[in-house]
């Protein structure tokens, strides 16, 4: 059976007069867009515009809910109860769903952002609260979470279809978690290294941790990042190398 992979990217992260990333350039290269819902980034105008751009490029649309922390870009942990987590996810799904409705497109998936994503990957109660909110909002949504973590197992437990996410440009700890962005070795900046990591994850279902440990994982979707001065070249090369290996690039 021919291998396939989804390429997802976090988009719609501008806010007011502040621009972020090159969404219009990245969109034609990916298959799924995770659109910020106004808490960590994005606003009503940006959400509507990004939904329209994704529709124009025939890209699968998903919600990218985060913690209410614009200044910290949703990357700082917050001490919240599971009920507060549940409510903030519902709130953001409702916001993006409204813009999908008026543009006559369907919201297909949900991927938590930043600290919310990391908290859910390590904390069962938080993972369950996120997953339950998604299920209660729309049980047909696909839940995107870090492979081999509580995000995936709790989403499966509540009855959601899941997509295990891997990262081409992030390094992994020995336990399969992502290396914290606070550490200098968290990201892979060398394009060739990122391509080799992506190919290994898709072709072999394995990744090598920063300490050299081989970790088994399932790869349904690869996250690529649209920000940074070499982002366009980076995404283009990863896509091209995957296709050279005969891997189909298609949405979830």
UniProtKB/Swiss-Prot annotation:
Subunit-structure text: Forms a complex composed of PxpA, PxpB and PxpC.
Any one biological process term the GO annotation gives: carbohydrate metabolic process
Catalytic activity: 5-oxo-L-proline + ATP + 2 H2O = L-glutamate + ADP + phosphate + H(+)
Enzyme Commission code(s) on record: 3.5.2.9
Gene: pxpA
Protein name, per record: 5-oxoprolinase subunit A
UniProt keyword annotation of Transcription regulation present: no
Keywords: ATP-binding, Hydrolase, Nucleotide-binding
């Amino acid at each position: 059976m021919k291998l396939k992979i989804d390429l997802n990217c976090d988009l719609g992260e501008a806010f007011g007069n502040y621009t972020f990333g090159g969404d219009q350039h990245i969109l034609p290269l990916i298959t799924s867009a995770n659109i910020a819902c106004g808490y960590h980034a994005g606003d009503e105008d940006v959400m509507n515009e990004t939904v329209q751009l994704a529709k124009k490029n025939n890209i699968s649309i998903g919600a990218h809910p985060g913690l209410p922390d614009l200044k910290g870009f949703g990357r700082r942990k917050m001490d919240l109860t599971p009920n507060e987590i549940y409510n903030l996810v519902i709130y953001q799904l409702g916001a993006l769903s409204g813009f999908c409705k008026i543009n006559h497109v369907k919201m297909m998936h949900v991927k938590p952002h930043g600290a919310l994503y990391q908290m859910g990957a390590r904390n069962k109660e938080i993972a369950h609260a996120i997953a339950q909110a998604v299920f209660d909002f729309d049980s047909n949504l696909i839940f995107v979470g870090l492979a081999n973590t509580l995000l995936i197992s709790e989403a499966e437990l509540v009855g959601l279809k899941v997509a295990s996410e891997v990262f081409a440009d992030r390094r992994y700890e020995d336990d399969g978690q992502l290396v914290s962005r606070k550490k200098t070795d968290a990201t892979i900046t060398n394009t060739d290294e990122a391509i080799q990591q992506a190919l290994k994850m898709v072709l072999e279902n394995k990744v090598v941790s920063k300490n050299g440990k081989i970790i088994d994982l399932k790869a349904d979707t690869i996250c690529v990042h649209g920000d940074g001065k070499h982002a366009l070249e980076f995404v283009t090369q990863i896509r091209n190398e995957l296709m050279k290996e005969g891997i189909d690039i298609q949405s979830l």
